[in-house]
């Protein structure tokens, strides 16, 4: 495995650790995905989340109906309008998730060393002795000694609302288990996770397809989080489905790696997907604890070299109920950044946590501090070596823009792009300064009406480390004259000045297309 020692080599003064950080318009280069739910769906709360640094809003359809999520989305739109901050939308599918069904919703108490039976007969009432499940093939997949985890959805792992079971025997379609710890299951649905077994259910279920068709398509979702991705074929099938739903042909698919099957096929999945979500909660059940860090470092390195965004989950579980993360969690967030994560995904912490805004703010601050000690020089050299020669034309321009920006100590890189690809390639080389991605819309027609592309591309950069999008005036085409491009550049520079990232006498690196040529130029601002 490649060495991932990406800390700065020169030691820092210990006293400097105590110095307060300088305020910045961009809280961190690393992006934050927030899951919206009961504790974070009010307009004021969402507005505060956006100001604190959330750039992607995740809608988890493992719970809540389409009507509930639509209300939340409408609130998000109002918050975006009031804060003037862009935010992308991610739809998270349920996938082949096993669930315990508790129709009565009465609390179920389970005592350690007792026994409980898992049955596919959903007509039965859930009790301390019997738990109905939504899958009839569990008995065929399990053997005595197998471990099963049952818990509240978006559990934190430290709660008494989750239980570990060990299979003692299989009786027909039923599975008899020994309870390993005392717990109380409250609610109507609980996630059931079995370690290292194949579940013969489709990755994109009929229910998922219906949600995407009825909710995702009208709302033009930016990202589809494909839960329990196990093979590249899962991504291909999802993409084929999206391609038939109009604008969703532009939706990016993020493969969620949640089990050993996905881990074993990681390389082929990465090749097919637009990005990867490392679902450490479920995967952490499948893997021995001492192997989790190894998977994280390897997976993030592969994503970085492929130039595809990687998202890490389950970082500050304790902030679901507490105002401050544990020391281990704070270190974990920083290490995720140093390992190469593009974004941090918050689940229970913002969905039902008591402090959604504070959580986003604290995670953003930790990310920003970690970014200061990231060894960009070592990372750049490693990435160039990995890509090899000859580079593609676009990759050569992107890497040159980053190297030039670092050499002249530019305050920002401005990249004109229509597809977003050039800006993402620049971000791949992890520049130490923000990349302002100026998305130039393209005009298209279906013979009945005109429309512009660009909004998807702008929002989809909100999950990429260091990329900050703005939409250019649609009257300026992508391959415009030098004079027109200069006017778009002036708008971009004014935006940078207004946001505080560009000041007088700063140097700025500009990456643009003039005619058929790609140009990297360095400009110095006067007063």
From Swiss-Prot:
Annotated site residues (Transition state stabilizer) in this chain: 256
As annotated in Swiss-Prot or TrEMBL, what is the tissue specificity of this protein? Answer: Expressed in leaf mesophyll cells, phloem companion cells in stems, cortical parenchyma cells in roots, glumes, anthers, stigma and style of young florets, and milky stage seeds.
The cellular location(s) given in this protein's UniProt record come to: Cytoplasm, Cytosol
Q: What class of enzyme is it?
A: transferase
Which residues does substrate bind?
58, 256, 281-282, 313
Does the record bear RNA-binding in its keywords?
no
Pathway membership of this protein? Answer: Carbohydrate degradation; glycolysis; pyruvate from D-glyceraldehyde 3-phosphate: step 5/5
Origin: domain of life = Eukaryota
| Positions with a binding annotation for ATP | 60-63
Query: Example GO biological process term?
Result: glycolytic process
The annotated phenotype of a deletion mutant is:
Dwarf phenotype with panicle enclosure, reduced seed set and outgrowth of axillary buds from culm nodes.
Assigned keywords, A-Z: ATP-binding, Cytoplasm, Glycolysis, Kinase, Magnesium, Metal-binding, Nucleotide-binding, Potassium, Pyruvate, Transferase
Q: Which reaction does it catalyse?
A: pyruvate + ATP = phosphoenolpyruvate + ADP + H(+)
Enumerate the residues binding K(+): 60, 62, 92-93
Q: Which residues bind Mg(2+)?
A: 258, 282
Q: What is its EC number?
A: 2.7.1.40
As for what it does, the entry says: Key regulatory enzyme of the glycolytic pathway that catalyzes the final step of glycolysis, converting ADP and phosphoenolpyruvate (PEP) to ATP and pyruvate by essentially irreversible transphosphorylation. Is critical for plant growth and development.
Tell me which family the UniProt entry assigns to this protein.
Answer: Belongs to the pyruvate kinase family.
Q: What is this protein called?
A: Pyruvate kinase 1, cytosolic
Q: Which organism does this record belong to?
A: Oryza sativa subsp. japonica
